[in-house]
């Protein structure tokens, strides 16, 4: 390590020390860094290594056109040298170096454009680790250092030293210490409470975390001790040399001691010849260890990388204990140049859709320098499970979040990443077993993508898999469904609900299943959002079997029969609508029911019963939205069912038969439940059911345990039409 200054011994040189005041904004920034507590101070090392990497990039770039630029030092590297005795940490690079003008301008007198912006961001609660994005990463050194010395040598200038204790000014002088050849040496004089950054373990930890993929070797120099076995003679020679240094000892005092030891040794050798080999001494040496041996895997040719290497990199990147499920390694060249390595994990994290979670897990590098790992603009939220790295050659190193949002380069990168992810999923879909694992974990992401990404909706829809009325225990794609469609079938039919069994036994699918029409079962809440956007697939419209206006393939004879039924039951529909009033929008004859007497369908553009259930479960729901989006209910009756036929006869025989009202309400409430809705007044419905149970058990109205108002209601059920007391069921209302 060079001496800090020789000006004290040579007065002539002292005149060459120039003092400069920091530009106001920089002084303010340094004050903010020094006087505010930050927990993640370790980022200073990342910033200084990043600066070194930039300097090395610059000299490497210049040497491409002028190889003689490297005559002052062929090797491009970064060295880290901790010194516990002096309490200094030194970062040395063989980069381009700085001229005197560079030193004065870059480290103090000219504020970078990001200085003020970074201070404002800090005061608004931004993380100190963002400092590099504003181009002022060097000043993060003052997070841990009380004084910083920068010694630098540029090919076009002398060797200079810059120094500041952050007191509002800095000095620049010609450096007469050890010649550097070319490059920059940053010496951090650490604060008393920051000595952890001199520990070998801590430095390795930080470099691995932040800088392991820098494109130049980072070598750590550590002074260590080791035991060395020597003979007693050699040990004594060493001891003698140490004694000679002490002025208090006389040479004459040493001689008899040596003779005595020698004679002792001769006697001991006779007893034990190996004795003199057993003496150990402590020897100090400098250990050099390269910390970033793992070269950026994404810069290599994919054909040269084994699955094991991808696996090791994935685990080091994600700390996952399992191997990845799939990998996509590619580069884009032309007007824009970047490389990317993307992984699909085997399982979704438990907090995949939590609001506080990072929006993505892609690490952004610019020319092998890590920039950030939470760049929201890099990939859409529905792909937030993708892990990996993107390394751009075109983005500026000091890019800020604000710049990223406006960056056209980033928009192109994002578009390419999405495209490659979809390619990866499509490739994965060819392997049925692996795709099944993928879909179990990430189907929600695909469906969220269909809801959010209109541009890629078609490709994403090809990745969907569903159970259907014909698929058994296998999930099938929409393409598979289309290949099995009937000749005269125009639509893709689907039903949404909570479970596979629930939708399979639903009244809505009765006629479709009877006619051999396949129905897709959508049983995840997100399916409701997905089909709101996915209107069609391969020219076939997706139609919900729980909504009004269901069109089924039918011949002329079936159409004629249906019209006759509508005419026959027109009067009953009118009576039922009058009884139910505002509870339903209309009552119509159904073309979808076979074994159920009736069902509740919803209007084409309203919510389904399942969607209404989902929305009611939202803790922060908007009740005004609930009001106008809640399903507009239509009651459909089955003209072929005995209950409906008997009810029609009863209503036509006596328009004023009051039992009809109760029967209609009971049918409506039961249909609500079977169609997936909830009851507004479940207790009243329960009372009706209890009365039916009493009738079934033969419990008489006069039974003292029976409720007066509830016991008589059963007398008005259809089998008891002849009973005189026809008005009893009115009481329940």
Curated annotation (Swiss-Prot):
The modification N6-acetyllysine is found at residues 58, 84, 444, 459, 490, 586. Keywords: Acetylation, ATP-binding, Cell membrane, Chaperone, Cytoplasm, Hydrolase, Membrane, Mitochondrion, Nucleotide-binding, Nucleus, Phosphoprotein, S-nitrosylation, Stress response, Ubl conjugation. Residues 225-279, 700-733 are annotated as: Disordered. It comes from the Eukaryota. InterPro entries: HATPase_C_sf (IPR036890), Heat_shock_protein_90_CS (IPR019805), HSP90_C (IPR037196), Hsp90_fam (IPR001404), Hsp90_N (IPR020575), Ribosomal_Su5_D2-typ_SF (IPR020568). The TPR repeat-binding motif mediates interaction with TPR repeat-containing proteins like the co-chaperone STUB1. This is Heat shock protein HSP 90-alpha. It comes from Bos taurus (Bovine). The lineage of its organism: Eukaryota, Metazoa, Chordata, Craniata, Vertebrata. The gene is HSP90AA1.
């Amino acid at each position: 390590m060079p001496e800090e200054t020789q000006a004290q011994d040579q007065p002539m040189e002292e005149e060459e020390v120039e003092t400069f005041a920091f530009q106001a904004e920089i002084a303010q920034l340094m004050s903010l860094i020094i006087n505010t507590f930050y927990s993640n101070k370790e980022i200073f090392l990342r910033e200084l290594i990043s600066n070194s990497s930039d300097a090395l990039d610059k000299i490497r770039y210049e040497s491409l056109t002028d190889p003689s630029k490297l005559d002052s030092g062929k090797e491009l590297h970064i060295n880290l040298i901790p010194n516990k005795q002096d309490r200094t940490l030194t970062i040395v690079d063989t980069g381009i170096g700085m001229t005197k003008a560079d030193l004065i301008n870059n480290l103090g007198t000219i504020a970078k454009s990001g200085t003020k912006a970074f201070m404002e961001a800090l005061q608004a609660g931004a993380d100190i680790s963002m400092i590099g994005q504003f181009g002022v990463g060097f000043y993060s050194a003052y997070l841990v250092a009380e004084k910083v010395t920068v010694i630098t040598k540029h090919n076009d200038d002398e060797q200079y030293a810059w120094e500041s204790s952050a007191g509002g000014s800095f000095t620049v002088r010609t450096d007469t210490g050890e010649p550097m050849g070319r490059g920059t040496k940053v010496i951090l004089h650490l604060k008393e409470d920051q000595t952890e950054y001199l520990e070998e373990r801590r430095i390795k930890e930080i470099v691995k975390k932040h800088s392991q993929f820098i494109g130049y070797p980072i070598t750590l120099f550590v002074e260590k001790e080791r035991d060395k076995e020597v003979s007693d003679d050699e040990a004594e020679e060493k001891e003698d040399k140490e004694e000679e240094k002490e002025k208090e000892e006389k040479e004459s005092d040493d001689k008899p001691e040596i003779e005595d030891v020698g004679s002792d040794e001769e006697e001991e050798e006779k007893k034990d010849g190996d004795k003199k080999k057993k003496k150990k001494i402590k020897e100090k040496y400098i250990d050099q260890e390269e910390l970033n041996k793992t070269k950026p895997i994404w810069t290599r040719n994919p054909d040269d990388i084994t699955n094991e290497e991808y696996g090791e990199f994935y685990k080091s990147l994600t700390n996952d204990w399992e191997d990845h499920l799939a990998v996509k390694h590619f580069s884009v060249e032309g007007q824009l140049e970047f490389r990317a390595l993307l992984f699909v994990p085997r399982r979704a994290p438990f907090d995949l859709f939590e609001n506080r979670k990072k929006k993505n897990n892609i690490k952004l590098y610019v020319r092998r320098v890590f920039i950030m790992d939470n760049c929201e603009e890099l990939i859409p939220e529905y792909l937030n499970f993708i892990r990996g790295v993107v390394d751009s050659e075109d983005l500026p190193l000091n890019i800020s979040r604000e710049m990223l949002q406006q960056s056209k380069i980033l928009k192109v990168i994002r578009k390419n990443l999405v495209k490659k992810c979809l390619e990866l999923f499509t490739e994965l879909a060819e392997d049925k077993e692996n795709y099944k694992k993928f879909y179990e974990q990430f189907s929600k992401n695909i469906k969220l993508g269909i809801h959010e990404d209109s541009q890629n909706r078609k490709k994403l829809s090809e990745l969907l898999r569903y159970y259907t009325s014909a698929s058994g225990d296998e999930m099938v794609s929409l393409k598979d469904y289309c290949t099995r469609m009937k000749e005269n079938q125009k639509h893709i039919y689907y039903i949404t609900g909570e479970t596979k069994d629930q939708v399979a036994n639903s009244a809505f699918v009765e006629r479709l299943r009877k006619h051999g029409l396949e129905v897709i079962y959508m049983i995840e809440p997100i399916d409701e959002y997905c089909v709101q956007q996915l209107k069609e697939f391969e020219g076939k419209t997706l139609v919900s079997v729980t909504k009004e206006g269901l069109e089924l393939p039918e011949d002329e004879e079936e159409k004629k029969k249906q019209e006759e039924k509508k005419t026959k039951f027109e009067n009953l529909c009118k009576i039922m609508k009058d009884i139910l009033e505002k509870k339903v929008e209309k009552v119509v004859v159904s073309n979808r029911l076979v074994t159920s007497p009736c069902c509740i369908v919803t209007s084409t553009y309203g919510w389904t019963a399942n969607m209404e259930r989902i929305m009611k479960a939202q803790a922060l729901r908007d009740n005004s939205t609930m009001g106008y989006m809640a399903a507009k209910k239509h009651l459909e009756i089955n003209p072929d069912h005995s209950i409906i036929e008997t009810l029609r006869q009863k209503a036509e025989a006596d328009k004023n038969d009051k039992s009809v009202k109760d029967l209609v309400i009971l049918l409506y409430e039961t249909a609500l439940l079977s169609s997936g809705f909830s009851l507004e007044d479940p207790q009243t419905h329960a009372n009706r059911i209890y009365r039916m149970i009493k009738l079934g058990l033969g419990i008489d109205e006069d039974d003292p345990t029976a409720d007066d108002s509830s016991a008589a209601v059963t007398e008005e059920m259809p089998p008891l039409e002849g009973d005189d007391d026809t008005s009893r069921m009115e009481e329940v209302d």
